[in-house]
């Protein structure tokens, strides 16, 4: 399916920020070419992204609680050239304190920071108790990206703690996408 219109409607950043980001990405690509430990740089027209997933099944990982990091290269004719090299990190369904434990949170934050993403997207279902929201959001706020952090609510978030999550996300400068596009 053609998702170009959806993507451009969902995330339309300030083009001046995007130009600066594009310059930074070109510098990163040059460094990648020089480094023998990296794969070849991403080809033109490809926007790399990062998907970080978690489940309660134990799988060997550098970071406790993180089962896998999946990287995708995305190309589409409607994605502007300015997004060449743009990196998106996505997390979802942490269910903090139920599936995802406190001891795993520091590892997740370090992993997200190591991805050097341009934007962090959060897909909801953050918690399993309102008392855990401040701790979780404060930890995720340590992940700084040039284009910011954007989050939506999951079904569990609407059932409880909805206002707590919104308040904490806004407190740390995160953008809550609720029935709107930015």
Predicted regions and their residues:
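Membrane-embedded segments
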Residues: 65-68, 79-167, 172-175
């Amino acid at each position: 399916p053609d998702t170009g219109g959806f993507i451009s409607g969902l995330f339309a950043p300030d083009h001046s920020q995007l130009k600066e980001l594009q310059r930074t990405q070109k510098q990163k690509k040059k460094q990648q070419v020089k480094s023998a430990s990296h794969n070849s740089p991403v080809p033109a027209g490809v926007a790399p992204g990062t998907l970080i997933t978690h489940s309660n099944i134990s799988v060997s990982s550098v970071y406790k609680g993180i089962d896998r990091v999946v990287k995708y290269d995305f190309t589409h004719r409607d994605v502007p050239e300015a997004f060449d090299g743009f990196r998106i990190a996505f997390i979802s369904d942490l269910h903090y304190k139920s599936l995802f434990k406190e001891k795993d949170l520091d590892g997740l934050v370090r992993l997200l920071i190591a991805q050097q993403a341009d934007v962090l997207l959060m897909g909801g279902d953050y918690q399993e108790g309102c008392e855990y929201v401040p701790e979780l959001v404060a930890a995720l706020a340590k992940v700084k990206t040039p284009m910011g952090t954007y989050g939506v609510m999951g079904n569990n978030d609407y059932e409880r703690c909805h206002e707590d999550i919104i308040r904490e996300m806004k407190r740390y400068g995160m953008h809550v996408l609720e029935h709107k596009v930015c």
